[in-house]
UniProtKB/Swiss-Prot annotation:
Cytoplasm found in the keyword field: yes
Cofactor(s) needed by this chain: FAD
Entry EC number(s): 1.6.1.1
KW NAD (keyword) present: yes
NCBIfam families (UniProt xref): PRK05249.1
PANTHER family, A to Z: DISULFIDE OXIDOREDUCTASE, SOLUBLE PYRIDINE NUCLEOTIDE TRANSHYDROGENASE
Domain of life of the organism encoding this protein: Bacteria
Gene Ontology cellular-component terms listed: cytosol
Name of the protein in question: Soluble pyridine nucleotide transhydrogenase
Catalyzed reactions per annotation: NAD(+) + NADPH = NADH + NADP(+)
SUPFAM superfamilies: FAD/NAD(P)-binding domain, FAD/NAD-linked reductases, dimerisation (C-terminal) domain
Family to which this protein belongs: Belongs to the class-I pyridine nucleotide-disulfide oxidoreductase family.
């Protein structure tokens, strides 16, 4: 006899992964509930991560643009804005996003429960709501999409008013003149750009020997040069020995013997999956040391009726990928298999000032693989559109196979890079000979546009062939 459950599926978390799963399930006729720990839906992406940090970055980059444009600024009266003022702008964007996403759930009749979820057994969840009451829900299947949080090493006192992580930095209400950013990954580099754009002194501590080592080396070098040129001090191959919170700031002692003092510290070195409160032991699951769960190609955990998507399964830890993972998991849960799958070449967008974006292979990877590739380049400063809008910093690089002309990788550094990359990505994904660099020479682009960089880069690369 088939058991009856309250729901066909319960989704834990309402970030991009949870939303993708919830919408995918409900569109296939499933009865679902969504459990969200916080007062507003949207998860870390909407409230502490992607959305507020990109809104911050946009505001800062517009200030920089104004101050550098001789039409508006004569350099005697620079436009200035405080971090706190700009945060008000981000709150407006966050509330629009929250309102819109709330509407998705309401229109699709998804029940939302607020509170902390924990497993009782493989089909039962207990929810502790904000007023302390306990509710039990049962479902045939579950999706764990509870995201991640900034990693807190035990020897750093995050209760100190001048020590922040990448979530709490959005509550910064004093005006720092000098900030130490520990961790030069994507988040560290993005905030280094934001603070430097607000004329704050920045010490960026990198635990590795170069910035964002997963990028094509030229892109990484471009960012390093741009930081250096703007006065960001980068300290490579450093680790902290001790972090000392003092009355007027923070002192960081490095293992190399150096000492740094600043008005505040942003610790941005790693993230931890939010699995510790789920009582996973009750369903025979175990997270690794960073709170992450292992899944198969259909996002199924070792417990067959429990799936996991988003940051909680680790790489690639992107909001864009999490949404797709949720959608794919929903299909697998209803149909037993998923015809869709995550694309092999997921584009990377890094919202530094200027942006970096890439898709496909790097020069270093292709060289190691002994692939006979050629390079086509376009400098933004040679494009009419870039000259008109004053976006002269940057370049587009296309890597393609010398013989087949197949595009193997695209790398872009400069304003709007994360948008520009998708034109090349669309051609790269074409099958049956559609992926060729010659497309960019044989098509007609609007003029003047930034997209025209593809035509310039394609001609540059094809002219190298002999």
């Amino acid at each position: 006899m088939q058991k009856s459950y309250d729901y066909d599926a319960i989704v834990i978390g309402s970030g991009p992964g949870g939303e993708g799963a919830a919408m995918g399930l409900v569109k296939q006729g499933a009865r679902i509930a969504v459990i969200e720990r916080y007062h507003n839906i949207g998860g870390g992406c909407t409230h502490w991560g992607t959305i507020p940090s990109k809104a911050l970055r946009h505001a800062v980059s517009r200030i920089i643009e104004f101050n550098q444009n001789p039409l508006y600024s004569d350099h005697t009266r620079l436009l200035r804005s405080s971090f706190a003022d700009i945060l008000n702008h981000t709150e407006n964007v966050v509330s629009q996003q929250t309102h819109m996403r709330q509407g998705f759930y309401e229109r699709n009749h998804c029940e939302i429960f607020q509170g902390d979820a924990r497993f009782i057994d493989a089909n039962t969840l207990e929810i502790e709501t904000h007023d302390g009451s306990i509710e039990r829900l049962t479902a045939e299947k579950f999706v764990i999409a509870c995201g991640s949080r900034p990693y807190h090493p035990p020897d750093v006192d995050f209760t100190h008013p001048r020590i922040y992580d990448s979530d709490s930095i959005l509550n910064l209400h004093h005006e720092p003149g000098h900030v130490i950013i520990y961790g030069a990954g994507v988040i560290g580099c993005e905030y280094a750009s934001i603070f430097r754009g607000l004329a704050v002194k920045v010490d960026l501590i990198n635990t590795r020997d170069r910035l964002l080592a997963f990028l094509d080396q030229e892109m990484s070098d471009s960012l390093s040069y741009h930081f250096w040129n703007n006065g960001v001090v980068i300290r490579h191959n450093e680790e902290f020995e001790k972090v000392e919170g003092v009355a007027d700031g923070v002192i960081m002692h490095l293992k190399s013997g150096k000492k740094l003092k600043a008005d505040c510290l942003l610790y941005a070195n790693g993230r931890t999956g939010n699995t510790d409160s789920l009582s996973l032991e009750n369903v025979g699951l175990e997270a690794d040391g960073r709170g992450l769960l292992k899944v198969n190609s259909m996002y199924q955990t070792a417990q067959p009726n429990i799936y996991a998507v988003g940051d909680v399964i680790g790489y690639p830890s992107l909001a864009s990928a999490a949404y797709d993972q949720g959608r794919i998991a929903a299909q697998a849960m209803i149909k037993g298999e998923a015809t869709a799958h995550l694309i092999e070449d997921i584009p990377t967008g890094i919202y530094t000032i200027p942006e970096i974006s890439s898709v496909g292979k790097t020069e270093q990877q292709l060289t190691a693989m002994k692939v006979p590739y050629e390079v086509g380049r376009a400098q933004f400063k040679h494009l009419a559109r870039a000259q008109i809008v004053g976006m002269n910093v940057g370049s587009l690089k296309i890597l393609f196979h010398r013989e087949t002309k197949e595009i193997l990788g695209i790398h872009c550094f400069g304003e709007r890079a994360a948008e520009i990359i998708h034109i090349g990505q669309a051609i790269m994904e074409q099958k049956n000979g559609g992926n060729t660099i010659e497309y960019f020479v044989n098509t007609t682009f609007n003029y003047p546009t930034m997209a025209e960089a593809y035509r310039v880069a394609a001609l540059n690369g094809l002219n190298r062939l002999f």
